[in-house]
Amino acid sequence: MEVKKLYLSLILLTFTFVGFAQQKISLNLNQVTAEELFRQIEQQSGYTIYCNPADMDSLLFSVQCVDELAPQALAKAFEGTAFQVSVYEGKQQLFVLKERSLVTSISDDYFYQRKELERGSSDYYLLNPMEQKATSENKVYTIGDETATTLPDKVQLTGVISDFRTGEPIVGAVIYEETTMAGATTDAYGYYSLSLPSGRQRLLIRGLGLKDTQRQVQLYGNGKLDIELEEEVYSLKEVTVTSERLARVQSTALGVERMQIKDIKNIPTAFGEMDVIKVVMMLPGVKSVGEASSGFNVRGGSTDQNLILYNNGTIYNPTHLFGFFSAFNPDLVKEIELYKSSIPSKYGGRISSVLEINAREGNKKEFTGQVSIGLLTSRVTLEGPIGEKTSFILGGRTTYSDWILGMLPEDSGYKDGKAGFYDLNAILDHKFSDKDNLYISGYYSNDRFRFDSDERYGYTNANASAKWRHIYNNRLTSTMTGGYDHYSYHTETRENPSDAYKLKFGINQVYGKFDFTSYITDKHTLDFGLNSTLYMLSPGTYTPNSDSSLVARDQIQDERALETSVYLADRWEITPKLSIDLGVRYTMFNALGPRTYTLYDPNQLPDETNGISTEEAGDWKSFKTYHAPEFRLSARYAFSSDFSIKAGANTLRQYIHKISNTTVMSPTDTWKLSDANIKPQKGLQVAAGIYKNFLDNTIETSIEGYYKTMEDYLDYRSGAQLIMNHHIETDVISTTGRAYGVELMLKKTQGKLNGWISYAYSKTQLRQDDPRVDDPINNGDWYNADYDKPHEFKFAGNYKFTQRYSLSMNCDYSTGRPITVPTSKYQYAGGEYVYYSERNQYRIPDFFRMDLSFNIEPSHHLTLLTHSMISIGVYNLTGRKNAYSVYYVAEGGRLKGYKMAIFGSPIPYVSYNIKF
Amino acid sequence: MKKKLIYWIVFLAIAISCISPYEPQGIESTEGLLVVEATLLAPYGTEVKLSRTISLNDMTYEPVSGEVKILSDDGVAYRLTETEKGTYTLEQEFVYRENVKYALDMILDGKHYRSEYVEPLRTPEVDALTWKYNEKYEQVDIMVTVSNPDVDVAYYQWKFKENWEVRAPNFGTHRWDPDARRVITNELDTPNNRYYCWAKDSSRHFILGSSEKFISTTIKDKVINEIAYGGSRLSNLYHISVKQYELDGEAYSYFRNLQNNVETTGSIFAPQPTEMKGNINNLDNPKETVIGFFVATTEITIEMYIEANEVPEMQVRGSDCLEVLKDFKGPQDAYDQGYGILTYGIGAPPEYMLMRCVDCTRRGGTKKKPEWWPNDHQ
């Protein structure tokens, strides 16, 4: 014991270094003194020998040996005596002690205790719970069974990377080993799975906004290593953050844009309100029809072809107040992912894009909150831990924009109007164990408008979901999700009691998803699973809204359908440079009764006059089934770690359609499920791209080109009545669409100046090629779609003067969208009327807008009770009256031409944000 | 219903937006298309107006002439006579025969046009023509109530003609005659005054109604005209004559589309304008666009008067017709500066007022009094 203590200070490492250069000696000694013996050995081998001379001055030694290691030779000399030889390899020292041996290293058990499981198991070994989170860069962590006799070639290392301060998992961090370039990116749960050679390894970890770090591991077998990373706070030096850029070049997916909330917070938007949807619209390939549009168009797709998911719930109307604000509280959003081209096999049901918005988990370490006050909206967020394993977030947002209506002129008659919205979020995250995690999310939003005590209009989004994540072993994980989505709107009038009415629409969905990810071998990762959604849609209910109203009650039959899919996808790394992603998704859609429907003469367009039979479907009986496979393929060839080319092809189908005859997503658009008369929409996209990063991955560039076709896209007929139409199939036509384009993007995400510039050229056209149509639009030729804007240039940039002051600017330029204009006029019924051109033959003037904002963070002390941020800016700096539409109105029987702009002048704003 | 929804959205946009006059450039004009406004009425009143579309920049309309007939499907043809260039009427009395359909037939510039054969419709009597003061918008709403027991769904069109007496706010005893260059006395008992005038107007757009959404064919209190505050219609006596026509569903859809194309297209949620096909075709070239819809129906007329003192809220108040000025060099000087005589006589200096306060011709009126006007104002 004393010896141990005595030599403790000499011990620096618990590892013995094997392989130190060892000298071999030869001895031929006869009856020599200890001193002579020692001298010979020391001379030949370089060792130093220690002893208590008093013990051996009377001894004489004889030893013969040839090419022996010094310790062995010395031991031979003392054989049969009471002396023992101890070796201290690290220092090339030998000790000769009477009847005792010197312990020259601390026992392996000294620092930790290991539980031994049965040998030969591939399960990992639990470290002491104290050691679960690897927080030190210098400590070497042992993974696996150290006492195993054989080391495997490859070892599977898994774990979760989380934020040191809040305990939240970190998404998109890259952990890799430099020499073999074996790497992995953490998924949505911060989970990574990495295959490495056994032995001593050094792993580098990079995460956006986090300090670059490393971990040392000694790998004996498969094991787990959870890592906590520190946030990179207030460092004035440049930070080399490469995870995002590596991710883009390395991944097989094309047309994917990932953004973290930090990227979103600095982009100036109208009224200083951080807006997730507006940021999405700044990305190349994403267009909108105009500033008041609540929908967006991705690569030539219409607004209903985007699947918008918020914590797995489908959102039908992603904005508040006609597109001025997004429906997502930015304080709760963690990241957004927009899939424009390669849509992963686990998603389906829309043919143009998937926008996935994921909320954060609550802070697991301490209770915090944020309050934000802006010109038009305010929000509050509270979060914190509940016990050791649970965390929560509550968020709320509301508007008080009535004041802007109060500014309207008296004689507009709408001075006393009210427009408002609020939304509420509640998230609960519970970790049962390392293997099981439950995430529950609830969202509710409500918009209501009341202009002059007459028209009232409102809509509601409500979503609830529960997600259970289970890790079976280090190669198989699964997520099971279930939820309920609801969207409804209503409009009502009361002014004239005789025709006061109320119109309601609603859609409900119940869904369940089982998603598995299996890291079968280090070359193949399989994703497979099953999704099922039950739709229940009420297309319209029209009721009288006063006692004396003569309105007849009318209701369109409810629609029900079940959409079930199974999918299987394989990410196959054929060689480290070439990897492909192959996926198949098979969907079956069943339209369910009760329903009474008409079948029409197939040789003519469905019309009230040519129905041939009326069918009835029973309750929950399937009366029409559509089923087909969808293919998702993409491939990447990486010439080097910063240069790759990719190509992909996807087919997709959509079974729910928005029926609208307005250019933008209007509040009264109706949705319809496919049934016996409405076929599913089909889409096909092929795309290819070149991706190169420059200057040590600080600048990302990409060029992507695509070609898309759409079939059975629903367009409406002339004079169509789309509201409360019992036979809406008689007012719509199947149209074909095509879109193609090229997108160029340059992105810089570090340094004082960061942001992106993009240019896109694209065309989107539609054609009515159904031969049954008598008088097709544009005579059956291709005509421009409403959102066809060939040239588009976008710039979003942020310049940090210091850590406290930064300037943000964005510019948006695009060709004017197509419109249908009058081309001549005539007299009728005592007034002037216009005759319109073929659809979308002309364009409104080009669109250009520039916004600027200045962000100030008054104080940066980490230990202050509250942190605040002020943002001052101008929206539409140049004040350009970007035409939203051009039209003619008859005034007093004469026509006058007008141009309407949404934001016709520069709009300054101030917003204030406190975090506590 | 949708119209109101869209209008308030437009007004929200006004607060922070701009609606500015604009003329799109580079439009390929579709002038020269045939426009046919044709209504067959029994017993009298049939009228067909022919014209062509003109470019948006032009101002004058050119009527079209040719041969116009009404055909019945049992072989009778009725020729219409051209009363004015481009306007054709049926002089004689016309009676609809049982189970007979009628079509419009025209030969213009060597091209032969014919409409589809339509079944004549019978227009019901108007149940009530009423008016109400609308406090919120400070206007008078003129409303119609009607029902039609003969059909399942009723579609109506209305037209109106207004005549009203314009009374100047003040009676000027004299006026300056710029041609004779002298002062003339205004006489209340002869037309030689500027106190009483008359004006007229008529409907300039489609006024349509449908009972599709209602429990019966009754449409109650449908506003067909609005008298805004500040005009001269209710300065003394107002008369409106409303004509009602029954339409069928196709004609209604066609006209409603035409009206929407000039009414709702500007707003954010405007539906895309489209052109619907009418029911008149060029027999040799069915692809030729012909604008218009031939309708065969009957006409029901109803009228009413509204007196100014029935609607005191509509009297123009707080105007500057209270200010009396005296310092002009003479009546000619006042006239040149836009002022007219209020009083003129020996003994006191003349008093002047803004011309439109003493002269009803400056308020949109003329001295042409309709023969049937029920009072003896001159």
Give the label of every model feature segment:
Chain A
Residues 488-490, 536-547, 552, 590-613, ...:
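Surface-exposed extracellular loop regions of Gram-negative outer-membrane beta-barrel proteins
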Residues 429-446, 458-603, 702-707, 748-756:
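Face-selective signature of the C-terminal outer-membrane beta-barrel domain
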Residues 289, 346-347, 362-367, 386-389, ...:
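Short loop/turn motifs that connect adjacent beta-strands in outer-membrane beta-barrel proteins
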Residues 509-513, 555, 563, 673-679, ...:
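Outer membrane beta-barrel strand-and-loop segments of large Gram-negative receptors
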Residues 21-26, 48-62, 149, 154-156, ...:
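N-terminal periplasmic "start-of-domain" segments of outer-membrane beta-barrel proteins
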Residues 119-148, 185, 209-211, 223, ...:
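Periplasmic N-terminal accessory/gating domains of Gram-negative outer-membrane beta-barrel systems
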Residues 804, 813-830, 847-851, 855-916:
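C-terminal beta-signal and adjacent terminal beta-strands/loops
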Residues 706-709, 728-823:
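Gram-negative outer-membrane beta-barrel transporters
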